[in-house]
Regions:
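Helical scaffold of the NTase/Pol beta-like nucleotidyltransferase catalytic core
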Residues: 1-41
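Conserved catalytic core of two-metal-ion nucleotidyltransferases
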Residues: 29-33, 79-132
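Right-hand nucleic-acid polymerase module
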Residues: 114-216
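Active-site nucleotide-donor binding segment shared across nucleotidyl transfer reactions
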Residues: 29-60, 64-73
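Charged/polar, solvent-exposed surface patches and flexible loops
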Residues: 16, 20-27, 31, 80, ...
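Predominantly extracellular/lumenal beta-strand repeat domains
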Residues: 47-49, 65, 80, 98, ...
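Alpha-helix boundary/N-cap detector
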Residues: 5, 9-20, 73, 77, ...
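Short glycine-rich, low-complexity/disordered patches
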Residues: 24-42, 91-108, 189-202, 212-216
Length: 216
């Protein structure tokens, strides 16, 4: 079962290293491919939602949000540019190339040689926000030949950032943490691996936001 990672020093070291890698990725995308992007951990900021399943490796789930690009519809080119840029950065840190999965780019598992030696990896989901405030994930469907690349709208994602901000302002973020943990474990126990961390996060924020009339 999932639980929140409590080792604050380890969390700080892990987030610092991976944050540097993500910053370098955004810089490389701009310099090499003229693509504007920003990044954030799912859950964002100091109140992130980093979970660990028992003693298994930790996945740091990042959204790489594309903010500027010449052709939004060439999804294959976008995925390839991000993959190539990510590999350039990973090699600079002595990491192996990333793996291209359906909805993310995943790194190898790493660990620190001193202190907490728990293994961790990075999962990067490429996203964009449309003019109506909906979020879309870049999907690489490998089941078809030729492979299909497309933007897939995340269900119920409209204005999710504003909803999360409202919840934090009302100091009810603990409710989101509770919901997120419950949802992740619910899908885990039912062997449902089709719901990414971002989808679970959207579900948690909406559940809490929609129950705001019942807040104490």
């Amino acid at each position: 079962m999932y639980k929140y990672v409590e080792d604050k020093l380890f969390l700080s070291r892990m987030r610092s290293l991976c944050g540097e890698i993500m910053q370098d990725l955004c810089h490389t995308l701009k310099e090499e491919y003229d693509i504007g992007a920003s990044f954030y951990l799912v859950g964002s900021g100091a109140r992130n939602l980093i979970l660990q399943n028992a003693n298994r490796p930790i996945d740091l789930d990042y959204n790489l949000e594309i903010t500027r690009i010449d052709d939004w519809e060439d999804c294959k080119e976008i995925k390839e540019c991000v993959r190539k840029a990510f590999n350039i950065v990973l090699r600079e840190y002595g990491w192996s190339d990333c793996q291209d999965s359906t909805s993310s780019l995943t790194t190898e598992k790493r660990h620190f040689n001193q202190g907490n030696s728990t293994e961790f990896s990075m999962d990067i989901c490429i996203v964009c926000e449309d003019t109506d405030g909906n979020y879309h994930r870049l999907i690489h469907d490998k089941r078809r030949f030729p492979n299909r690349y497309f933007w897939n709208q995340a269900p119920n994602s409209r204005n999710i950032r504003e909803k999360a901000k409202y919840i934090k302002e009302k100091e009810k973020w603990t409710l989101v943490r509770e919901q997120y943990l419950r949802i992740k474990n619910q899908y885990l126990t039912s062997n449902d691996y089709n719901h990414s961390s971002f989808i679970c996060y959207i579900e948690a924020v909406n559940n809490v936001y929609n129950s705001r009339k019942h807040w104490n």
